[in-house]
From Swiss-Prot:
Record protein name field: Berberine bridge enzyme-like 10
GO biological process: cellular response to hypoxia
Protein's organism: Arabidopsis thaliana (Mouse-ear cress)
Homology family: Belongs to the oxygen-dependent FAD-linked oxidoreductase family.
A Pfam family per the record: BBE
Signal peptide range in chain numbering: 1-20
Assigned keywords, A-Z: Cell wall, Disulfide bond, FAD, Flavoprotein, Glycoprotein, Nucleotide-binding, Oxidoreductase, Secreted, Signal
This protein's record includes keyword Glycoprotein: yes
Gene Ontology molecular function: FAD binding; oxidoreductase activity
Subcellular location: Secreted, Cell wall
Length: 527
């Protein structure tokens, strides 16, 4: 009898993880959902959209901001499960297991490689946009935020309760909390308060067996550590996060000053490299490098734009800038004082005077074809090398760069405290941005080739062994998993997580030995 039981269990496990036996019939998926435990007031199949449903395409495309993965040839899920209750999530997980389907978990849909809504094997999308509660506790200065809420919704709900509290997270307000936090999450408050995950102290998650853990005690410290920067989709379905809100002044000061190479940008960039990571931690100054028309017809040049925010009034900002970066010659007329919540709109390029209620719109206003890559810079780039970089920018034309300064609080937090390892020793992070609007495979190949060409060119100036990368700027070019092996995973894992990768693998092997939760860049199990 014991032998029979063991054989039965082995057969069950084998069936649940073998994608070659996956059931791809959407109707069979709906029937499976209805066989699972259900909430009588909200049947499981009622929230599942299949291709024959008139709303399927609308629901699927609603959170696909990257047109590279919104084509007729893009692999489609057999269903989009728009979960509204924990029971819906449990049922979806149960059917993924029963029918040998992959689960792709989507909160905001901003995965730059489309991994939250595409797959090369039979799959369905578990859409978390129905989970968007933000519960702010002013007494404790904390909040619970569901993983399907956007950063804009989080910021707005905080501002409803207080104009002197905020949260350190991203600048794009349509980012989903679930994906943003699970990759680390950073923005213009990171030099003062660190990353999003540095201010998370609780969470809830559903595991591969449908078990629900509603706090860090029940889920265990290892799992809690892993889902704060290690890619939560490798460990389960995160329901939400308990976060610590941070103090912000009644007024912050923002500015944006641009200079071309002909106007002295090279000198300013050289000074920015030593200034931005070492200045007052209340000040964050991003540098963007873009291509603009030159003074002569048909000539292009590089525009360096310094975009800053100071946690305080403009007079104090000017004191800091005159002391640490006088070369920029920042004037009071360059500065605008505003509430922190209004600075959120400034950083996301909304026109001045836009009502903050726009933050409640979870959808991207304009979709584009997009590619992102990332790097970390640990030593100053010489003037000669900077000249070569600017020359290359003009040559490739399409690439834009954001240089985001570290230092401050980022340099004080140990690299092992969370899976996000890029702490002390980093001067700044580079985000490579390639956006285009023209459709066509040949156009896409051209722009992706330019992105890779520029990335290769930057090799001597950035980190090495490994060449580090930021998970939230996901890039399949640095490695991907075909067979879900440890050897494959280590290629990209070491770049995203450095030494923390091994602990992530150990945790994964302990709590998900069958590798139920996987994608092209998930954490592998150790075999």
């Amino acid at each position: 009898m014991e032998k029979l039981l063991v054989i039965s269990l082995l057969l069950l496990i084998s069936t649940s993880v073998t994608t070659s036996q996956s059931v791809t019939d959407p109707i069979a998926f709906l029937r499976c959902l209805d066989r699972q435990p259900t909430d009588p007031t909200s049947p499981n199949s009622a929230v599942a959209y299949i291709p024959t449903n008139s709303s399927f395409t609308t629901v699927l495309r609603s959170r696909i901001p990257n047109l590279r993965f919104d084509k007729p040839t893009t692999p489609k899920p057999i269903s989009v499960v728009a979960a509204a209750t924990w029971t819906h999530i449990q049922a979806a997980v149960g059917c993924a297991r029963e029918l040998s389907l992959q689960v792709r978990i989507r909160s905001g849909g901003h995965d730059f490689e489309g991994l939250s809504y595409t797959s090369t094997v039979p799959f369905f999308v578990l859409d978390m946009f129905g989970f968007k509660t933000v519960d702010v506790n002013l007494t404790e200065r904390t909040a619970w935020v569901d993983s399907g809420a956007t950063l804009g919704e989080l910021y707005y709900r905080i501002s409803e309760k207080s104009n002197v509290l905020g949260f350190p997270a991203g600048l794009s307000t349509t980012l989903g909390v679930g994906g943003h936090f699970s990759g680390g999450g950073y923005g213009n408050l990171m030099r003062k308060y660190g990353l999003s995950v540095d201010n998370v102290f609780g969470s809830g998650i559903v595991d591969s067996n449908g078990n629900i853990f509603t706090d860090r005690v029940s889920m265990g410290e290892d799992r809690f550590w892993a889902i704060r920067g290690g890619g939560a989709a490798s460990y389960g379905v995160v329901l939400g996060y308990k976060i610590q809100l941070v103090p912000v002044p009644e007024k912050v000061t923002v500015f944006k000053v641009g200079k071309t190479v002909g106007e002295g940008a090279v000198d300013l960039i050289m000074k920015w490299q030593s200034f931005a990571h070492s200045t007052d931690r209340n000040l964050f100054v991003r540098l963007t490098l873009t291509l603009v028309n030159g003074t002569k017809p048909g000539e292009n040049t590089v525009l360096a734009t310094f975009i800053g925010m100071y946690l305080g009034r403009s007079d104090k900002l000017l004191t800091v800038m005159n002391r640490d970066f006088p070369e920029l010659k920042l004037k009071k007329t360059d500065c605008t004082e505003m509430r922190w919540i209004d600075s959120v709109l400034f950083w996301d390029d909304y026109p001045v005077g836009t009502p903050t209620s726009v933050l409640l719109n979870p959808l991207v206003a304009k979709k584009l074809f997009m590619k992102r890559k990332s790097d970390y810079v640990k030593r100053l780039i010489s003037r000669t090398d900077l000249g070569l970089i600017l020359k290359k920018l003009v040559e490739v034309e399409k690439v834009k760069m954001n240089w985001n300064p570290y230092g401050g609080r980022m340099g004080e937090i140990p690299s092992s405290r969370t899976p996000f390892p890029h702490r002390a020793g980093n001067l700044f992070n580079i985000e490579y941005i390639i956006d285009w609007s023209e459709a066509g495979d040949n156009v896409e190949k051209k722009y992706l080739a330019l992105a890779n060409e520029f990335y290769r060119f930057m090799t001597p100036y950035v980190s090495s062994n490994p060449r580090e990368a930021f998970l939230n700027y996901r890039d399949l070019d640095i490695g991907s998993s075909v067979k879900s092996t440890y050897q494959e995973g280590k290629i990209y894992g070491a770049k995203y997580f450095k030494e923390n990768f091994e602990r992530l693998v150990d945790i994964k092997t302990t709590i998900d030995a069958e590798n139920f939760w996987k994608n092209e860049q998930s954490i592998p199990v150790r075999r």
